[in-house]
Swiss-Prot record:
Gene source species: Carassius auratus
Entry comment on modification after translation: Phosphorylation at Tyr-15 by wee1 and wee2 inhibits the protein kinase activity and acts negative regulator of entry into mitosis (G2 to M transition).
Ranges annotated as spanning the membrane: none
Phosphothreonine carried by residues: T14, T161
Record note on quaternary structure: Forms a stable but non-covalent complex with cyclin B in mature oocytes.
Name of this chain's protein: Cyclin-dependent kinase 1
Coiled-coil intervals, chain numbering: none
Phosphotyrosine PTM sites in chain numbering: Y15
UniProt note on regulation of activity: Phosphorylation at Thr-14 or Tyr-15 inactivates the enzyme, while phosphorylation at Thr-161 activates it.
Purpose: Plays a key role in the control of the eukaryotic cell cycle by modulating the centrosome cycle as well as mitotic onset; promotes G2-M transition via association with multiple interphase cyclins. During G2 and early mitosis, CDC25A/B/C-mediated dephosphorylation activates CDK1/cyclin complexes which phosphorylate several substrates that trigger at least centrosome separation, Golgi dynamics, nuclear envelope breakdown and chromosome condensation.
SUPFAM superfamilies listed in its UniProt record: Protein kinase-like (PK-like)
Keywords per UniProt: ATP-binding, Cell cycle, Cell division, Cytoplasm, Cytoskeleton, Kinase, Mitosis, Nucleotide-binding, Nucleus, Phosphoprotein, Serine/threonine-protein kinase, Transferase
Amino acid sequence: MDDYLKIEKIGEGTYGVVYKGRNKTTGQVVAMKKIRLESEEEGVPSTAVREISLLKELQHPNVVRLLDVLMQESKLYLVFEFLSMDLKKYLDSIPSGQFMDPMLVKSYLYQILEGILFCHCRRVLHRDLKPQNLLIDNKGVIKLADFGLARAFGVPVRVYTHEVVTLWYRAPEVLLGASRYSTPVDVWSIGTIFAELATKKPLFHGDSEIDQLFRIFRTLGTPNNEVWPDVESLPDYKNTFPKWKSGNLASTVKNLDKNGIDLLTKMLIYDPPKRISARQAMTHPYFDDLDKSTLPASNLKI
């Protein structure tokens, strides 16, 4: 900890307070996340430290870099590269009646997919993607933050400040209690974020797990074993769910063209193995007119 100077508190993350800091030797400005763990007495579980140390290997232009893992008494500090703006703040700053430039929506979505594909190829899931942990700089670059923390520390029901963790971006298989899930959970989250980039409004903004499910069902239809094999045997599926018919995504997400709606539809397929993968999504015609050579990861092969 002696290498870093805390400058100011900049926010409250899922796991604890986030500070802006500076490396005393190099002068690099950093974000320092203090991880508050449930069982303070026992100190930091070694499994969590191992998990987190692996994340230092995730180096990609669209993934926020974990620079250092520090222990101080029973507290764990994660030191990340610093970016001052997140996607939620940016969307909130767009004046009423105005929307994000469609080319920027496309560029951001493509970069998010690049970052997620890089991590998925290394068998790391995010599990908790949302606009608050997508960070942006002033050069049009977007980066995914908090990768792998869900696996190391679990996804709490409430933030340590007792604020409820948002369900808006959570995949239906997770909401329905599936014990095993994989990379498609992140693709679902990115789909809901894609819609929000276009409209500035969350696509499914439920205030409880059942409300969240019903908002999804009202738009996409209530799933059954026909459209999603074995969904009816998931722990939290009830045969008493109202049977909504599939609606029309295009009427809900008005600012996307035909290709955009087609890609969004494929990202929001109920059956996880049928849901488009990040790699497949990147070759979708929606991105045909995007100049990928200007993107930060353009020279990388995944």
